């Protein structure tokens, strides 16, 4: 890998993203990962769990779903409004696409399709701890926030 990332999974993604990374991006930023401290079955618990399965970083104390983008950005994660990879964390603003009106929602990108649509996996939409999926059009997907690495 050409990347300077310590995490080999991040290094592979960075190589794919050459030329797109924010200026001065440091892939070895503090991840904030001290284990899964989110309540079992919540959307935040699943987002952390799935990222761990994929070998990607996620903070243990990003707060309520609505605050994940800001919390991640503050630690140095690359956060923007474009789904790029399987494993990206999708942050839904409160009320967006059926997200809770106060807490918001987070999920994980499972597919990024050629037409810009995405398929996500998520927890606590169909019941506590129930993992389900949804697909969003490119237009819908472009309205959300994504935490990459």
Regions found by a protein language model. Name each.
Residues 1-3:
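N-terminal prepro-regions of secreted/extracellular proteins
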Residues 7-106, 111, 122:
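Secreted/periplasmic proteins that engage bacterial cell-wall peptidoglycan
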Residues 110-149:
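Aromatic- and glycine-rich peptidoglycan recognition patches
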């Amino acid at each position: 890998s050409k990347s300077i990332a310590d995490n080999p999974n991040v290094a592979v993604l960075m190589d794919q993203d050459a030329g797109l990374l924010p200026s001065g991006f440091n892939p070895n930023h503090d991840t904030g990962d001290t284990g899964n401290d989110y309540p079992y079955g919540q959307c935040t618990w699943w987002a952390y769990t799935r990222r761990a399965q994929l070998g990607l970083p996620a903070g243990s104390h990003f707060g309520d779903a609505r605050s994940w983008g800001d919390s991640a950005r503050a630690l140095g994660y690359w956060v923007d409004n474009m789904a790029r990879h399987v494993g990206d964390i999708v942050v839904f603003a409160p009320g967006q696409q059926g997200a809770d009106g106060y807490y918001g929602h987070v999920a994980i990108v499972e597919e990024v399709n050629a037409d810009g649509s995405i398929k996500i996996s998520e927890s606590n939409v169909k019941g506590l701890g129930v993992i389900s999926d949804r697909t969003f059009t490119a237009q819908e997907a472009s309205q959300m926030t994504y935490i990459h690495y």
